């Protein structure tokens, strides 16, 4: 860890992947590494676990390729060469009843930066999916709470969504939303991975669209793959609003790019601008 700041200083554009053990200590070190500038992390193969080494090899190659492609295109701003058709802003807007956020690669750095300026001003529940193993999410929830100045914890089965709630999907469990007599509540399950992920954004987005209808704001931040694209489509169908991080400020423009290229996003913004836009939208402004 002590070498990371020096590495970043010597090679600011370097992509660093942290290999971590699936332990509490490993999770703490990994979250620190991400805060110090590591681009992503990968869990070390578990001794004796069937297929563990093969899974590790495949995931490592995928991450190297994704980060390498991003590094190669950063200076070219390739997003500008990909036509993005933004959704028109709605003529009439209602104040969202919940804020949904999804992130993967780059998310442990992007999420605190996105939420710190605005979280305390948002009364509605904030629900977050960050692709992480089960041993990592409790540590990340604590770090996120310290960064944003608002209580944040892992979601639990049966949680009722109330004002001021900030819930992080636990590792290895999908977080879904359902209506209940008290309003809306959380359901957790270990269903099949979606888009190779558990937790995944799509189950949250799709069930929240059914539970909240049009009163949703969905934000998709930096991440590899296309998790969140199908769910963003459901949110749009229900009348909700979707905004995404731009390529220039994303570590990997997979998830937000997939949503934007599908035509579901009404705004594609740099991270700082996206944060302020989300705040205005959560306050009920047309933005």
Residue ranges, per PLM feature:
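Conserved acid/base catalytic micro-environments in cytosolic active-site loops
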Residues: 1-287
């Amino acid at each position: 860890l002590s070498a990371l700041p020096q590495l970043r200083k010597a090679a600011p554009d370097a992509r660093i992947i942290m290999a971590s053990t699936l332990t509490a200590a490993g999770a703490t070190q990994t979250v620190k590494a991400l805060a110090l500038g590591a681009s992503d992390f990968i869990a070390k193969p578990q001794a004796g676990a069937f297929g563990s080494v093969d899974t590790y090899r495949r995931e490592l190659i995928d991450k190297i390729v994704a980060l390498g492609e991003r590094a190669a295109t950063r200076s070219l701003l390739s997003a500008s060469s990909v036509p993005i058709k933004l959704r028109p802003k709605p003529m009439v807007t209602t104040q969202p009843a919940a804020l949904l956020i999804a992130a993967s690669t780059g998310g442990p750095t992007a999420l605190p930066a996105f939420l710190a300026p605005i979280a305390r001003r948002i009364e509605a529940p904030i629900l977050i999916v960050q692709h992480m193993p089960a041993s990592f999410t409790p540590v990340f929830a604590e770090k996120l709470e310290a960064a944003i100045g608002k209580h944040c914890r892992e979601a639990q089965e049966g949680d009722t969504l109330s004002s001021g709630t900030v819930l992080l999907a636990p590792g290895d469990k999908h977080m879904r939303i359902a209506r209940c007599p008290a309003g809306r509540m959380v359901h957790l399950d270990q269903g099949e991975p979606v888009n190779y992920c558990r937790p995944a954004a799509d189950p949250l987005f799709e069930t929240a669209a059914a539970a909240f209808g049009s009163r949703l704001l969905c934000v998709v931040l930096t991440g590899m793959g296309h998790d969140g694209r199908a769910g963003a489509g459901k949110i749009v169908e229900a009348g909700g609003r979707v905004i995404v991080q731009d390529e220039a400020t994303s570590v990997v423009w997979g998830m937000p790019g997939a949503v934007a290229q599908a035509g579901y996003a009404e705004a594609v913004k740099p991270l700082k601008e996206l944060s302020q836009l989300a705040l205005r939208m959560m306050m009920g402004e047309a933005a």
